[in-house]
Amino acid sequence: MMKSIILTLNDRAEGVTADGTRVPRALPGEEITLSKENQFKIVLPSKDRITPVCTHYKSCGGCSIQHVTQSFIKEWKSNVIKSCLSARGIETIIKPILTSEINSRRRVTLHGMKTKKSVTVGFFKKNTHELISTPSCELVDPEILSAFSLFEEITLLGATRKSIIEISVTVSKAGLDLNILNGKKLENQSIMKITALCENFNVARITWNEDLLANFLNPTIEFQGIAITPPPNAFLQATEEGQEILIENAMLSVFNSDKVIDLFSGCGTFTLPAAKRSEVLAIDKTKSMLSAIEQAWRETSGLKKVTSRSQDLFKEPVGKEELNSFDSAIIDPPRVGAEAQSRELAQSHIKRISSVSCNPKTFSRDAKILVDSGFKLDWVQPIDQFLWSSHIELVAQFSR
C-alpha cells in the first residue's frame, strides 16, 4: 500500500494524485492509501465528505459524486466551466449554478435481464456490464419508481436469457412513455399481457423495438405551457425544472427578434416558446421530431409562423448567406458540439446567439470561434440537472 494525497478533482469527478493517478470517489485534500489495483482507503477524510444518501451508491454506476456536499459540487462544476473557458482565453460572467431537486429526473434508461431463477432491472455497475437491481433511486421521479414491478414483468415476458433489454422511461403529462429496445419478438399472448399490465400502471404509450405496441393516451410534454407529443425516445431535458430554466434563459437572447433560427432543434424545446414572439425555422436531422413540432404548432393558437427542415448540421451546416436573413439563433448541439456550424455563425450577420450545451469543453471550443469573430460571451448560466454526476448543462448568450 502506498500513501498519497489527492490534489484535485478532474472533470470526471475523479481524485487526482501528484503523479497523475486517478482515484474515483476520492476528494481533494484527502490522505489515502492506494493499492496496486487502485483500491484506496481513506486515512484523513476531506471536511466536505458526507455519507451518500442512496443505499445503492457503492455498487451502482449511475452516480459518481454522492459522497460530497452540494456546496462543493456547485463550486466544482462552476470551476469546470470557468477552466474550460480560461483555457481558450475567454472570461465572462458565470452566474450561480441552479440545481434540480432530488427525485426530479423524468427520463431514465434502465436495463433488464433474466435468468432461469430471477429477473434483474436496474443500472450497471460502474465501467461494467454487470446489472444490479435498483428499485429505489434518489434521482428518479417517484412515478417511474412506482412502476418498477412493471419493468420486471416486461423483462420476464420480453427478454431472452442471452440478451439485456433497454427500458427507456419518460414521465409525460398523460402517464409513462415506455420505449423497449432489444426485446424478443412477442407472440400475441405476450402482447396482451404486457398491454394489460401497462394499463394498470398509468402508461400512456409503449413501443417495442421501435414498433408501437399500445397508445392509451398521447404522452404530452409542455414547453412553457405549449403541449407537444414527442416521438418515442425523443431527446428531452432530464428534468422539467431544468428545461424551464434553460428555456427562460434562452429566450432572453431572442426576445426582440423578428426571425429566429433554431439549430439542432430536437422536438422544439426552444422553437415553440420562441414562436410566441418570433417567426422560427427549426432545423434538425430527425424528421419525426420536426413532425412533432409542426403538429404542436398547428394545435396551438397565438404562435408566430414555424417552419422546419431536416438537415444533418454536421455534414451540411447552415451557410452564412442563409443565416443573414435571421436576427438571432438558438443552438443546442449534442456533446460533440457544433464546430462547423459555429464557423458559419461567426461569418454571418447574426447579432445574438443563445447557446445551450451539455459539454463545457466543446462549448468553449465553439465559443472561441465566435469570440474571435467579434462576438462577446455576455454570460453563462450553469444548470445541474444531473445530480451527483460529473455532467453539467449550461445556456449562454453571445452578442455583437
Role assignments for model-derived ranges:
Residues 44-51, 58-164:
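Extended interfacial segments that mediate partner engagement and assembly in macromolecular machines
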